[in-house]
Amino acid sequence: MAMTAAVKDEISRLPVTRTCCRKAEVSAILRFAGGLHLVSGRIVIEAELDTAMAARRLKRDILEIFGHSSELIVMAPGGLRRGSRYVVRVVAGGDQLARQTGLVDGRGRPIRGLPPQVVSGATCDAEAAWRGAFLAHGSLTEPGRSSSLEVTCPGPEAALALVGAARRLSIAAKAREVRGVDRVVVRDGDAIGALLTRLGAHESVLAWEERRMRREVRATANRLANFDDANLRRSARAAVAAGARVQRALEILADEVPEHLAAAGRLRMEHKQASLEELGALADPPLTKDAVAGRIRRLLAMADKRAQDLGIPGTESNLTEEMADNLAG
């Protein structure tokens, strides 16, 4: 199940006993998923949701808390709709429900943000408002570089009210307008986990954190693999270049080269891409990689000094242009 659907399924099943929280959740759902329509001079309230569980929860709460019956209409997939949509409609008593939920003020004017009783309510009301907003128009993407928890809002005032509710929960959320649509976004992974916990989506938090950890482990492993590959490539290029310089060093020094340095040089030439550690293991008797590196370094230095004294090209003259570029990079 996708993360968004999993969260909505879980919080739709969450038992909430406090009346103030149930009221705040219903108010938020109607504000973010609903609309007020005037039909024959009366207010009709509709809320369109994308899960049957959330729609049934809303229908039940409207009846149990506010005493109004509603009808549930299922809209089959079609056109731009990929899945079924569920519309909860209140016709009889719509005017009264609009006032009870704070969708309109005392004069019957629509509230553009969140109802005052939700904005000024307790922390549990802020949690309930977020729960309702997420059920209405929320989404959660998989953990990753662009992971986010978002709620599409009916307007900038509602977005700012939701940001304020998040602030009361000590969660950083930002209001954004994208192509004329107002959204509230939480991007930080820890903040997303904290908000899901506040919503009561405890199973989803565990799944989110597990996927997040798996991705981080995978990303770290990839970085280390890339790092190791790059190091191996650099080491191999350096070894090939060292072999070319050693070949020139032995030509310059000829019979004047000490045997232990010549032996290290011959190992380098015979095993051009071997690591220093591998060369040490091939030596007789075996040497440490530092001992091999030291002997090759002294061989090259001796040859370069001899070349300078003779006025002839040194060991680096044996490097191709590509070798020189690789060493410089």
Curated annotation (Swiss-Prot):
Pfam families in UniProt: HTH_WhiA, LAGLIDADG_WhiA, WhiA_N
Gene3D superfamilies: Homing endonucleases (3.10.28.10)
GO MF entries: DNA binding
DNA-binding region: 275-308
Keywords tagged on the record: Cell cycle, Cell division, DNA-binding
GO biological process, one term: regulation of sporulation
TM segment ranges: none
Matches recorded under PANTHER family: CELL DIVISION PROTEIN WHIA-RELATED
HAMAP family per record: HTH_type_WhiA
Function: Involved in cell division and chromosome segregation.
Family: Belongs to the WhiA family.
Protein name: Probable cell division protein WhiA
